[in-house]
Amino acid sequence: MASNHKSSAARPVSRGGVGLTGRPPSGIRPLSGNIRVATAMPPGTARPGSRGCPIGTGGVLSSQIKVAHRPVTQQGLTGMKTGTKGPQRQILDKSYYLGLLRSKISELTTEVNKLQKGIEMYNQENSVYLSYEKRAETLAVEIKELQGQLADYNMLVDKLNTNTEMEEVMNDYNMLKAQNDRETQSLDVIFTERQAKEKQIRSVEEEIEQEKQATDDIIKNMSFENQVKYLEMKTTNEKLLQELDTLQQQLDSQNMKKESLEAEIAHSQVKQEAVLLHEKLYELESHRDQMIAEDKSIGSPMEEREKLLKQIKDDNQEIASMERQLTDTKEKINQFIEEIRQLDMDLEEHQGEMNQKYKELKKREEHMDTFIETFEETKNQELKRKAQIEANIVALLEHCSRNINRIEQISSITNQELKMMQDDLNFKSTEVQKSQSTAQNLTSDIQRLQLDLQKMELLESKMTEEQHSLKSKIKQMTTDLEIYNDLPALKSSGEEKIKKLHQERMILSTHRNAFKKIMEKQNIEYEALKTQLQENETHSQLTNLERKWQHLEQNNFAMKEFIATKSQESDYQPIKKNVTKQIAEYNKTIVDALHSTSGN
C-alpha cells in the first residue's frame, strides 16, 4: 500500500481523474524518434480545442511547478501524456496548420473590417471637409460681392453728398461699361496670346530637352580630361549664374526703389522741380569740374605754344615726306610715259620689219585682251578637246595592243601603217603639251597683271586718303592757332564763365532752401491728412473688412491643408496591397506544405 501510495503521489492525476500506476495504457502512443516537434511554432500558438494539447499562456514558468510533477511544459514541448479520453495530439498535421491559418485569416478579416470602418469614417470626414471647403468658397464669393456692393453704396453716398444729377450718373455708367467691354476684349486677346506663348514654351522646352540629351551624349563620348574640364566649367558657370541672380535681384530692388521714387515725384510738382534743379546743378558741377581740369591741363602760354609748334613741325615733316613720295611716283609715271612715247616714235621711224613686229605686238595685245575676256570659254573648249584627244589616244592604244599580237603575220605595209600611227600619236601628244603650257603661261600672266593692278589701286586710294587727312589737320591747326594766339580773350571768357557759375550756384542754394521749407509744409499737411483718414469711420470699417477677409483666406488655406493631410492619412491602398500580398504568401506556403506532405 505504501508503494502504491508513493507511486500515485509521484505521478500527476490525468484529466479523467485516474492515476497511472505502472506502464501507460495501450491507448497512449509512446515517444519515439519519429515524432515531429513543431520547432518553428512560437509558444502558446497551438490550435485551441484540439485533443490533448494544453492551452499555452505564453508566459514564464512559475517557481512552484516542478519538472517531476508536470511532464508537459508551457512552451508546447510534449512529454508523457495521461488521460482517459484517448491519445493527445503528438503530430502537427494538416488540420493543425489549417486551424492556425483559419485563426490568422479571421484576425486579418477583423483587421480589414476595422480598416474599412476607418476608411468610411475618413470618407465621411472628407465629405464634411469638402462641404466646409465649398462653404468657404461661397463665403469668399459673398465677401467679394459684399465688398463690391459696399463700394457701390459708398459711391452713391458720395454722389448724393455732392448733389450729382442722374444724367451724370448714367454717363459714368456708360463710360464704365465701355471700359469693361474694352478690358474684356483685351483679356481675351491676352488669353489667346498666353495660350500661344505656352505652346511656344512647350516646344522650346522639348527642344531644350533634346539639346540636353545631345549634350549628355557628347559628354559621355568625351575623354576623361575633357569631362573634368567640362565639370569645372559647369561649376564656375553655376557660381556665375548665382552671382548673376543676386545682382539681378539687387538691380530689381534698385529699379523698384527708383520707380517708387519716380511715382512719388510724379505726384508732387515741387519734387519734380527739385529734381530738375538737382540735375541742372549736377550738369553745372560736372561742367565746372571739366573746366577746372582743362585749366589744370592747360599749362603756360609758352608751353602750349611750344607744343603747337612741335606738332606743326611733325605735321610739316609728314606732309613733306608724303609730297616727296608723290613727286617720286609722278616722276616714275612721267618716265614710263616718256619711254612709251619714245617707243612709239621708234616704231613710227622704223618701217618694214619693225613696223610689222609692232603690228604683230598690237595684234598680240588685242589677242591677249580677247583671250582674257574669253578665257573661261576657251578653257572649257580646250578641256573638252583634251578629253577628246585622251579618248582618241586610249582608243589608239587599245587598237595598237590588239594589233601587237598580229605583228608576225603582218607584212611590211602594216609596219609602215604602225609607224604612221605612232608618228600621229607623238604629234598629237606634243600638241596637247603645247596647249597645256600656253594655258598655264596665260593664267600666270593674268594673275600677275591683276596683282599689279590691285597694288596700284591701293596706292592711289591711300595717297588720296592721306591727302584729305593732312588737309583737314592743317585747317584745324590754323583755327587752333588763331584761337590760342588771343590769350587775354581766353582768360576773360574763362573768368566770365566762373562768375556766371558762382551766381547760378547762389541762386540754386536759395531755391534749395525755399524748397526745403515747402517740403516741410507738405509733410505737415500729409501727416494731418493721415490722421484725418485714420479717424474716419469708413476707413476703419474698410480696414476691418480687409483684416476679416485675410483671416478667412488664412482659414481657407488651413482647411485645404488639413483636407490634404487627412486624405493622405486615409489612403488605405498600400495597407490593402500588403494584406493581399501576405494572404497570397500564406496560400502559397499552404500549397507547398500540402505538396510536400503528399510527396512524403
Curated annotation (Swiss-Prot):
Give all Phosphothreonine modified positions: T73
Ranges for region Disordered: 1-33
User: Positions of the region Important for interaction with IFT27?
Assistant: 561-600
Q: Where in the cell is it found?
A: Cell projection, Cilium; Cytoplasmic vesicle; Cell projection, Cilium, Flagellum; Cytoplasmic vesicle, Secretory vesicle, Acrosome
Tissue/organ expression: Highly expressed in adult and fetal kidney and expressed at lower level in adult heart, placenta, lung, liver and pancreas, and in fetal heart, lung and liver. Little to no expression was detected in adult brain and skeletal muscle or in fetal brain, thymus and spleen. Detected in sperm (at protein level).
For this record, an example GO cellular component is:
nucleus
Q: Which UniProt keywords apply?
A: Bardet-Biedl syndrome, Cell projection, Ciliopathy, Cilium, Cilium biogenesis/degradation, Coiled coil, Cytoplasmic vesicle, Developmental protein, Disease variant, Flagellum, Joubert syndrome, Methylation, Obesity, Phosphoprotein
Omega-N-methylarginine: residues bearing it = R51
The keyword Amino-acid biosynthesis is annotated on this UniProt entry: no
Where does it mainly reside?
other
- Molecular functions per Gene Ontology: beta-tubulin binding; chromatin binding
What does the protein in this record do?
Component of the intraflagellar transport (IFT) complex B: together with IFT81, forms a tubulin-binding module that specifically mediates transport of tubulin within the cilium. Binds beta-tubulin via its basic region. Required for ciliogenesis. Essential for flagellogenesis during spermatogenesis.
User: Which family would the database say this protein is a member of?
Assistant: Belongs to the IFT74 family.
Quaternary structure, from the entry: Component of the IFT complex B, at least composed of IFT20, IFT22, IFT25, IFT27, IFT46, IFT52, TRAF3IP1/IFT54, IFT57, IFT74, IFT80, IFT81, and IFT88. Interacts with IFT81; the interaction is direct. Within the IFT complex B, IFT74 and IFT81 mediate the transport of tubulin within the cilium. Interacts (via basic region) with beta-tubulin (via acidic region); interaction is direct. Interacts with ARL13B and IFT88. Interacts (via the IFT74/IFT81 heterodimer) with RABL2B. Interacts with IFT57 and IFT70B.
Q: Which disease is it linked to?
A: Bardet-Biedl syndrome 22: A form of Bardet-Biedl syndrome, a syndrome characterized by usually severe pigmentary retinopathy, early-onset obesity, polydactyly, hypogenitalism, renal malformation and intellectual disability. Secondary features include diabetes mellitus, hypertension and congenital heart disease. Bardet-Biedl syndrome inheritance is autosomal recessive, but three mutated alleles (two at one locus, and a third at a second locus) may be required for clinical manifestation of some forms of the disease.
What's the protein called, per UniProt?
Intraflagellar transport protein 74 homolog
Q: Which organism is it from?
A: Homo sapiens (Human)
Species classification: Eukaryota, Metazoa, Chordata, Craniata, Vertebrata
The encoding gene: IFT74
